[in-house]
Design a protein with these regions (language model features):
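Positively charged n-region of N-terminal signal peptides that target proteins for export
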Residues: 1-4
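Bacterial Sec-dependent signal peptides at the C-terminal "C-region" and cleavage site
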Residues: 13-30
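Short beta-strand elements
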Residues: 202-213
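Tryptophan-anchored aromatic micro-motifs
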Residues: 25-75, 91-93, 120-149, 157, ...
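Sec-dependent N-terminal signal peptides
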Residues: 7-12
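Acidic, glycine-rich flexible loop segments
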Residues: 149-176
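Mid-length scaffold segments of soluble, non-membrane domains
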Residues: 86, 93-107, 115-117
Length: 234
């Protein structure tokens, strides 16, 4: 009997190790900045329309372009769901005084549900939602080639949502009181049509992903003084 119990425990341990390895291997296909934010989550099947999450404009995007962290501004003017996992997008970008229009797509790669969700300040949201989750997607935004200084943005996007008790998927601002709170996080590259050269580029709401030492703020985003002259001092 003791031997059977020992064998059963060993089998359970091996299965658990195997599942953990499988999970870690599955996550390695994503950028490290995304992996760090989804460790407490698992894949979930979800049929949803994320239009209102992606088009949320409750706060402006903060962004940079280039290794010198030049200030980068972007706004989404329209977001429409075109297929089960694709959204078509139009918008405007601005670097210094150079303004470009763009259009492109956002393609959902995976939906995930958090295993141990929090419930907001003083647990005020406890019992107010079915689940909290996030979505990993890829984006490709092409600026108008006829405009000066234009190019193409490609990369990964991570955004957060929660499902209400009525089954509605909404923008997750439950933890917006937290210093580290962020949403709609984009990070990738921009490639010039003219020179074919690429630059790192990222933007997000409240915080900027994959931004090195750009953000030195504790309670909120605050640009590192050594980059202030790159468009941030206005």
């Amino acid at each position: 009997m003791t031997r059977k119990i020992a064998c059963s425990l060993l089998l359970l341990i091996l299965v658990t190790i195997g599942l953990n390895i499988k999970t870690k291997v599955g996550l390695t296909r994503y950028p490290s900045w995304i992996v760090a934010k989804i460790v407490d989550s698992k894949p979930v099947k979800l049929t949803a329309d994320f239009t209102h999450v992606l088009s949320n404009s409750s706060t402006a995007y903060i962004g940079y372009i280039g290794n010198n962290y030049q200030k980068f501004d972007i706004s989404l003017q329209s977001v429409h769901k075109s297929t089960a996992n694709r959204y078509t997008v139009t918008g405007v970008t601005m670097v210094r005084t150079n303004r470009c229009n763009f259009q492109g797509t956002i393609d959902v790669v995976e939906n995930r549900q958090f295993s141990h969700p929090t419930f907001g300040l003083d647990n005020s949201m406890k019992g107010q939602f079915k689940r909290r989750g996030c979505t990993i997607a890829k984006y490709r935004f092409a600026e108008n080639a006829q405009q000066k200084g234009s190019g193409v943005f490609v990369g990964y996007l991570l955004f957060y949502w929660y499902e209400t008790n009525k089954g509605e998927i909404v923008y997750d601002d439950i933890d917006d009181f937290s210093d580290s709170y962020s949403n709609n996080q984009y990070a990738g590259t921009w490639q010039s049509y003219a020179t074919k050269k690429s630059k790192p580029c990222a933007w997000g709401q409240y915080r900027v992903p994959n931004s090195g030492d750009l953000d030195v703020g504790a309670a909120e985003f605050s640009v590192n003084p050594k980059y202030a002259r790159n468009g941030w001092s206005k």
